[in-house]
Amino acid sequence: MSDLNDRLASYIEKVRFLEAQNRKLAADLDLLRGRWGKDTLSVRAMYEGELQEARKLVNDTNRQREELEKEIRKLLDELSEYRRKYEDALRGHQIDRDRIDELLNQLSGLEAEINLLRRRIANIIEEIARIKKENLQFANELTKARSDLDQETLNRIDFQNQVQTLLEEIDFMRRVHDQEIAELQAMASRDTTPENREYFKNELASAIRDIRAEYDQICNVNRMDMESWYKLKVQEIQTQSTRQNLEQNYAKKRLRVQLTDLRGKLADLEGRNSLLKQTQELNYQLEDDQRSYEAALNDRDAQIRKMDEECQALMMLLDTKQTLDAEIAIYRKMLEGEENRAGLRQLVEQVVKTHGLTQVDETESLRVLKGETASRTSFQRSAKGNVSIQETAPDGRYVVLENTHRSKEEAIGEWKLKRKIDGKREIVYTLPRDFILRPGKSVKIWARGQGGIHSPPEQLVFDLEDTFGSGSNVQTILFNREGEERATHIQRSSHTI
């Protein structure tokens, strides 16, 4: 940019120098009119250095233009690459969002399962508490049964002692009765009457039998009662102990099964908790990646905006350079025309003023002809979009339209090009339907019979008119389909003697 500005400043200085030279030459022209054609060779030699410098300047400008075009193409390629990467990043961002939604759904399902398992664990804990309570109750009953067993054992010992006491008492009573019987027998033996002895003996034997029978009956009854009661108590204790053992075994088995299930569920829950922690860590990492990604996108957007601004500045500079190239080309053609003629016919002075922000170009030229007439021509261009009127031939042979945008096509089908000559005559040309003007391209519209070839989209031929017209005040206006003015080109010429 600085180099181009330096070159532009140098060019402006050169133009000013040429202005001074032209003024000097204009003063010398009056002297040359009287002796026209005498000093042609000397004048040509005098301007040969100027022509060489102009050619060198044109070559340098063309070379700089090619370098700028290469740089712009490189920037456009980089911009396309950044756009592609940006689109890839957007697609990756969408995939990450879908993955986050899927993980969130899985997390919701896992949280629901965890809540369900927590409720089941609470129910199992309540069941364990109930079983422990029942076990405590069974233990209390077992303790009571053992206490009853001990009491019954003590009762049995007491009854055995009572039996022993009764047996001893029976034995004592037997001895007493035997002694009484012996005494009665002794008394009976002292009885001398055989009938009395026999009678007492029989009575005594009968009494003894009755006593023995009664004693045996009492002993049998007591023994049977004791045995039945003892067997009943033992059976009850055994039955109760067996039932308690069965219940305890069943409770133990059920607790073992529940404990195994709880251990399995606990391991499952630990695995799920580990998975949840990993998911949470992945979410945190994903959020960090998203923040980094958004920061990178913001940086990239800032770089893209900066590149767009630089690209726009370069395009504005390129437009200015193209305008200068066009003016230099005109100047070169005029100078080359001087080389091809026999004498000095005309001197040309051009001053270019470009306003890139308003998209209005003004060009003013002064033409001094042989004889007594001087012609001054000024050009003014403006555009309200990407399509502008780049050039109009002063003799009305052609009109050039250009798309200044570097990447956007412009559909200008059925647009109208109106050309007004000196406020009187008006020529209207309608562009073909569905005509597309490509980015950075131009189309030259030739009048009929002016050497143009109809080869869209580079060249078109206006078959209805032989010329677009020429005059001292020519306005060329481009309208869109809706009749809105999109671009203008104004040419004003004045002649002085």
Swiss-Prot record:
Example GO biological process: protein localization to nuclear envelope
Ranges for region Coil 1A: 1-32
InterPro entries on file: IF_conserved (IPR018039), IF_rod_dom (IPR039008), Intermed_filament_ifa/ifb (IPR016451), Lamin_tail_dom (IPR001322), Lamin_tail_dom_sf (IPR036415)
Positions of the UniProt region annotated as Linker 12: 185-202
Record note on quaternary structure: A and B can form homopolymers.
Family note: Belongs to the intermediate filament family.
Name recorded for this polypeptide: Intermediate filament protein A
Gene source species: Ascaris suum (Pig roundworm)
